[in-house]
Amino acid sequence: MKRRVFLKHTLVGALTSLAAGPVVGLGAGVETPPPINLQRLFDTSDPEVAKLAEAIFRQCVLGKLSAPRGALKRTWITAGGGFVGQWIWDTMFVVDLLSLLPDMEQNIRDVFQNYWDFQVRWNQQRPAYAHDMVSCMIEPQNETKWLEYPAYSQIPILAWGVERVYRRNGDKELVRQCLGPLERFHEWYWRERDVTNNGLVAVGAYSGDIQHGRFETFDYECNLDGLKLTVHPTRKGEKEGAWYGDICAAGNTAYLIMGERSLVYLAEATGDKSLAARRQRRIDKAVDAMRQHMWDEEAGTFLSVNRDSLKQVPVATIGSWIALMAGVPTTAMARRMAEALRTESWQTPLPVPTVDRKDKRWKSDAYWRGDVWPAPNYQIATGLVRYGYQDLAADIADKTVANAMKNGVSEHYDAVTGKALGVNFLGMSCTIATMMLDGLTNKYRLKLREIPK
């Protein structure tokens, strides 16, 4: 019997008391699964690991499912706290774990369809060059001003999210639903964020607000302190505006490469060889561009660059390390990245800080300017394992889990004290459990229960 069939038949029952409190997000209109006994979901010999995992699944995963309302006409996933809406990157970490649970297929399809419904609405009222953007977030209360705000996107990992769900639950209907809109979203990204056609993507915002442009990536990352928005370098027209960032971000470029790799995988899974070939061409060009222009041997990582001059921005930030997960570095580059991550620049008591500790702007509790976030830690650890650095990955993952056990599950943390910062049980902090389930940890072991053979 396969694991999912086993789960469907054995995890029905009263919700465990260890993950106290109601599942706050569920409401009328959500396709409610059978009650899940979270105690029976996990296989671990450590009761503290079980308690942590149960709390994460209740509060960060199941607790973020929300009923249709306002601008969101289908089941959606809220981020948590005061972040009321369906974001791009937050949501992908949640659906990844949601797909492990039985009878969640339709809810997950609805979550993705919210993005594609937005694409249709957006395209009806925007010029052709702006078509197929997916906004950073869709807010249920924003039914009248959504065309003006948010007029920017976010880290492009929707395709990665679909791949993760498909690998976990085999939902080909979801893949068929998403392939077309995903490719169009990626083409928007290349068209409107790689405006010099060099294979590197910048940030931007149709609002013309510089901070909105920064919101497309790690909100206050130090590499974007000098960001300016300009008009399109080649397209002319009386309605053109200063919407295009002049810094190509190492993080967002790597994320788009990662998304393209996921799209190749999904296309091949459905037999669409031409789609896979189109995406592979994008990957090859972008990987070459990152290696040629963004790699810095001294820093031991990838740096953002000026869009027009390709001069590197001299600071390494959290986005510098996403290239590992995206498969960008050569073997030699990855070795140098592992060396750099072992230095005091990045080995804070709780790693990995969001900017080089030697940078004068670093502050251990500053938002994307020295603090620590579970989701990037998960992605860095995943990338390290990809290149064979399991011990370093486990060190990062184990310290992240241990800190959550001590200080609670939270949005982000102080890199020195480990103090919890921001929103408790933010949805994407579910990646603390993902680290264990993906086998990235050494000390803290967690698996889903398997049927005895």
Tell me what each language-model feature is.
Residues 159, 166, 257, 263-264, ...:
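Heptad-repeat amphipathic alpha-helical coiled-coil interaction surface used
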Residues 1, 22-44:
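C-terminal segment of N-terminal export signals and the immediately downstream linker at the start
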Residues 5-28:
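N-terminal export signals
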Residues 88-122, 319-329, 377-390:
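Alpha-helical support elements that line or immediately flank enzyme active sites
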Residues 45-56, 103-117, 171-190, 270-291, ...:
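Extended, well-ordered alpha-helical scaffold segments
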Residues 36-86, 110-148, 198-248, 288-372, ...:
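Extended glycan-interaction surfaces of carbohydrate-active proteins
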